[in-house]
Amino acid sequence: MHDKKSPMANSHYLKNLKQQFRNKNLIETTIHLVKCNDHDSLAFLARTYGVPPQLRHVVWPILLKYHPMCISPNITSNTISWDPITNDFILNDPFLKSKAPTDKQDKSDDENILPYDIESIILHDLKKYFHSRSNPAGSSSNANTTNIATPTPVSSSDASTISSMEVLSPSLDYEFQIIETLKNAIVKFLLKWSKIFKYESGLAWIALGLAEWYPIYPYETMSPFNETHSFYEVEDYVVLSGRKHALLSTNNGNNGNSNSSSNNTNNNNTNITSGMHNLSINTNTSLHNSPYISHTLSYLYKEYPLPFELRSKLPTKPIFSFSALFERLALVILHCPDTILAHKQLKNDSNASSSSKANSNFNTNYFPIISGGDLSFQTQVFFKVFSSILPELYQPLTEESSLQPSSSRNSWIYWWLKCSGAKALQRQDRGRVWDLLLGWRPKPNMDTINFFLNYNDKKMDHLYHDTPQCDNEQYWMKDWIALYNNDPFWFPDLDSMALGSKKFPYDYSVFKELILRNRYGGTQSKAQKDNTVPSPGSDSNDKSELKLPFSSIDPHMQLIFIFIAILQFNEFKLLEFEEAEIPEFLNNVPLLTKFDDSSYRKLYENTESSITSLPSSPTTSTMASLQSSSNSSAHISNYHMLIEVGNDAKASHCFDDLLNMAGDIWRKWLWRELEESSL
């Protein structure tokens, strides 16, 4: 007698099936785009679908190479601040409480050399990743020794058996070299930027977060980085696998204990570093008979398998050293527009205006919810949205000590907002959040770029394109763009407005137009229509030209609404917590994207089944089935849309659902603000 599956089970199976189709097609498309260096399309996929975890070490350097905030950087300063009373800059006390300055320190500052005690503090913070928590109770492992996963010879016939790894204790020297390399990357950043940014522990955790996806070479200080060196020609590359991964072992006698602990990532905080040894594409390799065994990324490919045929298409030479890539990532995470310049521009425009009301309200007109503000503004918006969207949770949280930390570095708000989820989010969730940051792109014209980067004096629009640049782009990108023909943070008519133009130079001028266009029963005048630009997702008579959708708002503002969505997703759980449990939860958020993570881990299992037998590119039927099941809010046309506020249903363990929830919160909250404003 055949067992009948319940409708719920069938629905779950179909969802997994569609997700596997989509993820496999996404991996193949991403590899194709990497091969032809189509960074515009890669950025689009990163900010909408996310970069497959198997490919972040290849895609992230490309995204950061062309990121506007890296080409024209400006970061928040923790050494100086603007005093509106004296109308001048003042020196801040560093977040790091150091000893009274000595002659040696004063001299080192003048020579742009870091104070003598900074490196020891950096090392102390880095070691917390490896040793801050002991092994699970009952473990015989030394709590002060990390574990390294050493690959053994395997067959390449099955991606799931790419590296059978036995956990061994590395030498202390090897671990020291790993930490030393991370420290040197931070030191290089500080030597370059220390005039405006002093060391904070967030830098250590940003470096560690990058090292969980991008390989580092522990002996970089002894053997300088060379772009001609392949990842696969140099031994001893390392990728960190996260603080909370359980011990992996296929051959030791404690396998049962390891497996049981692996089911609870919150209880096992032992770090595993993946020893990334010689990966060769030479069929005469002396290490293994396999022509292409990835030991350089052995742990990563064990977690997230990638078949031999696809691995062989990946580039082998790194674009950046780890320290260079870390600097670029830090520039994006710590980015801040020039708020002083923005205030001056608003004041000058107000003085030039004949309206005394405009002159008196120029300060209230500065509300850069679209173009982005500094950390203080982001924090203000976060709590403003929090209190508006989740009042039941906001009130008890504001009464708890979790919002009154003794140090900003110990606060979950610090890790969430200033460090973009470093330390507080799980490795998988943080990787997906950073995909969004690194994939952010404004429309490729200087008016729009300067709207977001108001300090910019570089011409860079020629680096970006609004159409895919790969050959046969229709074949690879058409269906993906059809699934997400709008930015997740779209707002009615926002995409059709020429941001940064003379008509819309500031956020408040955009808000005025949005109110005018989206009033219920309102109509769009001819003058309004003349000041619109075509929407990427709109139908055009020219069907041969495929347009990429671009980002609608600043990426750090996007993160605010993603974090609010995380709170909404965990609202009932947080309401039930004891006071002491709340900050622990917020500083160590459990894995949010279980469904996504499981799908990528099991993507190439049962390779003989029909599920995994995909064509070499996305098919119309496959992508059509995905399109029909995708969230409808992402597909609505941009033309004069009136907001329809629906229910914010609790999301499943999928980042797409979380992203859609964040977009809904953004639209709901902003419309409330616009309706209540006096613009």
Swiss-Prot record:
Q: Which GO terms describe its cellular component?
A: cytoplasm
Entry's transmembrane regions: none
Biased region (Low complexity) positions are 135-153
> Which InterPro entries does the record associate with it?
Rab-GAP-TBC_dom, Rab-GAP_TBC_sf
Q: What is its main location?
A: cytoplasm
| Stretches the record annotates as Disordered | 135-159, 250-271, 524-544
At the top level of its lineage, which domain of life is listed?
Eukaryota
What's in the keyword line of the UniProt record?
Cytoplasm
* Family affiliation: Belongs to the OCA5 family.
Q: What does this protein do?
A: Required for replication of brome mosaic virus (BMV), a positive-strand RNA virus.
Protein name as annotated: Oxidant-induced cell-cycle arrest protein 5
Source organism per UniProt: Saccharomyces cerevisiae (strain Lalvin EC1118 / Prise de mousse)
Q: What gene does the UniProt entry assign to this protein?
A: OCA5
